[in-house]
Amino acid sequence: MGRRRPPDRAPVLLNCFREVVGEVSSDRPVFIGGKSMGGRIASMLLNELSSSGAVRAGLCFGYPFHPFGQPSRVRTEHLEQLKAPLLILQGERDPMGCAEEVSRYDLKPPLQLQWIPDGDHSFKPRKRSGRTEEMNCDLAVELADQFMRAVLA
């Protein structure tokens, strides 16, 4: 079994994202996004890629507002400069940005934040919540669909 490696550094990931978007046909609306760090990288490129017309908006599933266990190291500076729509779907109990912590951040449109009930970083709820992971994933899909339809309207 192979050893788990950390992800590439941000400059490598940013360039990879740019390359992939550059290969996508522009005859249809393009949305970028990702889970956790992938969503963060997409959000960091959103202004650049939307101003060039390459993408319409972004989606983040479980945004890492701060490193695990380090709530004072907030990663929101670039979010304050957004010009294109961005939807962040976040579990209420996400250890990298729970509802209580994130409610104190100064997040404004065009950023939209939607909470996944009792969800952790992967949207998994506790059993006692009465929700299931499937319910939360279905909700995330529904919210993402509504967001994309609104952007395209």
List PLM regions with ranges.
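Hydrolases whose catalytic domains are alpha/beta-hydrolase-1, hotdog thioesterase
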Residues: 41-45, 69
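Conserved alpha/beta-hydrolase "acid-adjacent" motif
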Residues: 95-101
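Short beta-strand/loop motif that positions the catalytic acidic residue
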Residues: 81-83, 88-90, 94
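Gly/Ala-rich beta-loop-alpha elbow adjacent to hydrolase catalytic centers
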Residues: 34-42
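Serine-hydrolase catalytic machinery in alpha/beta-hydrolase-like enzymes
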Residues: 1-31, 120-130
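Catalytic active-site module of serine/aspartate enzymes centered on a nucleophile-bearing elbow/loop
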Residues: 127-153
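A conserved short beta-strand
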Residues: 52-65, 69
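Short beta-strand immediately N-terminal to the catalytic nucleophile in serine-hydrolase-like folds
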Residues: 29-34, 61
